[in-house]
Amino acid sequence: SELFRKKLERALAGQPKGSGILHVHPRFVSIAAGQKRKNLLWAEGRGYSLKIRGDEAVMPGEFRLDFEKN
């Protein structure tokens, strides 16, 4: 969704480009990806390669970003 993308945009601000894992509550995997993977493609266009993982420990509507160490 657009709201999720805006939250993601704020979280990525200032982060170095690279690969990472976006942890979301399992019910929010589809929302995090966006319609036709729009949110993932948006991030890719800005230099971030993100994979989404369902994680019961993450509150619904929230997310956690873990970037791979280079």
Please provide the spans of the model-predicted regions:
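Auxiliary Fe-S-binding modules of radical SAM enzymes
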Residues: 1-70
